[in-house]
From Swiss-Prot:
Belongs to the metallo-dependent hydrolases superfamily. HutI family. Binds 1 zinc or iron ion per subunit. Its EC number is 3.5.2.7. This is Imidazolonepropionase. The keyword DNA repair does not apply. Fe(3+) binds at H73, H75, H243, D318. Pathway: Amino-acid degradation; L-histidine degradation into L-glutamate; N-formimidoyl-L-glutamate from L-histidine: step 3/3. Catalyzes the hydrolytic cleavage of the carbon-nitrogen bond in imidazolone-5-propanoate to yield N-formimidoyl-L-glutamate. It is the third step in the universal histidine degradation pathway. Keywords: Cytoplasm, Histidine metabolism, Hydrolase, Iron, Metal-binding, Zinc. The keyword Iron applies. Pfam families: Amidohydro_1. Zn(2+) binds at H73, H75, H243, D318. GO terms for molecular function: imidazolonepropionase activity; iron ion binding; zinc ion binding.
Length: 404
């Protein structure tokens, strides 16, 4: 009896990104077959059942198929716009001057608090659509622009709603420990009390967050304050991730590892002890070249140390209104290769397999393996390096989410 599938893509070249395979796990003359939204077969044509059939057979005409892209760190949902601040910066205004004038994160918090859920969804959709147009099939979206319970929950709900409005998998992170709200009057300890005692229990009860994030930095929260948030999150059964070592080395990478974090992100100032701790904890390093570029950082993340210790490397846009208004994972890869000297293979793994690992969803997506969701990106390219090499160019032929 013929083996039946829902859809078959044939005459394709596959970059499977499978673990344990050299390079990108390339298969020439490949076939992908989907059943019930999942990959039922991904491999050489010679291994595919001769009688395999489906109502829809797509001839890829030699195009490349990769796993659907994963953007594992974004702040996609927010109110307002800060393009005017960019103009002020170009005219010579400092961050401090902009903040004193009511700009910076304070302005985004005010605009986000003033927006209802529909307005937040409507504002985020063009940003999401830009990412989907480049083959993104899984995206992480953080809260962190409410800094009080109701708005944080509204941000998370809006993020989940995006996954209903569009064919994309959305993972959400609660980022209540992002910044200090104006009404806290500079009292970080009291605000962290509120995060741990009020916000986190409400978030956990709502079921709207898949993870808990925090920003550990001199301008944000200390190691002790971050530890309190993480301990409370773990007690509620929520995994953690951390904005770490972006502007200074406060030991964020090591603290993330101590709590078994899914990922530590930014990491420009991470030292060897931090890298080694991340390797032992299997915490993924998420590098964010868009923010590095946009705010003109000079300290690069220690890619060689991460390689030395075997830390997995992911890449993400860090899409946000203040430091990385970026909605292109393709450009992100080019930036990582050019600015951080990452290889083509590292970049492509960083926006597929390792991005999925950083979100704790590698069992479900990120590689072309039977049993995973059939999330694909099909490209009009001659070789995978083009996806990293070219700038301002989108060769996506088709995006497939869960087999359709």
């Amino acid at each position: 009896m013929a083996e039946r599938f829902d859809r078959i893509w044939h005459n394709a070249r596959l970059a499977t990104l499978r673990e344990g395979q050299p390079g990108l796990g390339v298969i020439e003359q490949g076939v992908v077959a989907a059943r019930d939204g999942r990959i039922a077969f991904a491999g050489p044509r010679s291994d595919f059942a001769a009688d395999g059939d489906a109502p829809e057979r797509i001839d890829c005409a030699g195009r490349w198929i990769t796993p659907g892209l994963v953007d594992c760190h974004t702040h996609l949902v927010y109110g307002g716009d800060r393009a005017h601040e960019f103009e002020l910066r170009l005219a010579g205004a400092s961050y401090e001057e902009i903040a004193r004038a009511g700009g910076g994160i304070v302005s985004t918090v005010a605009a986000t608090r003033a927006a209802d859920e529909n307005e937040l969804v409507t504002g985020a959709l063009p940003r999401l659509d830009a990412l989907l147009a480049e083959g993104v099939t899984t995206i992480e979206i953080k809260s962190g622009y409410g800094l009080e319970t109701a708005t944080e929950l509204r941000q998370l709900s809006a993020a989940r709603a995006l996954g209903v409005r569009r064919a994309v998998s959305v993972r959400t992170s609660f980022l209540g420990a992002h910044a200090l709200p104006v009404e806290a009057d500079g009292d970080k300890e009291r605000y962290i009390d509120r995060v741990c005692d009020e916000m986190l229990p409400a978030v956990a009860q709502s079921g709207l967050a898949d993870a808990v994030d925090a920003f550990m930095e001199n301008i944000a929260f200390s190691a002790a304050q971050t530890s309190r948030v993480f301990a409370a999150a773990k007690a509620l059964g929520l995994p953690v991730k951390l904005h770490a070592d972006q502007l200074s080395n406060l030991g964020g990478a090591a603290l993330a590892a101590e709590f078994g974090a899914l990922s530590a992100d930014h990491l420009e100032h991470t030292d060897e002890a931090g890298a080694a701790a991340m390797a032992r904890a299997e915490t993924v390093a998420v590098l964010l070249p868009g923010a590095f570029y946009f705010i003109r950082e000079t300290q690069k993340p220690p890619v060689e140390l991460f390689r030395k210790h075997g830390v997995k490397l992911a890449l993400a846009t860090d899409c946000n209104p203040g430091s990385s208004p970026l909605t292109s994972l393709l450009l992100t890869m080019n930036m990582a290769a050019t600015l951080f000297r990452m290889t083509v293979d590292e970049c492509l793994a960083g926006v597929t397999r390792e991005g999925a690992r950083a979100l704790g969803v590698l069992a479900e997506t990120g590689t072309l393996d039977a049993g995973k969701w059939c999330d694909l990106a099909i490209w009009d390219i001659n070789r995978p390096a083009e996806l990293v090499y070219r700038m301002g160019f989108n060769p996506l032929h088709q995006r497939v989410w869960r087999g359709r």
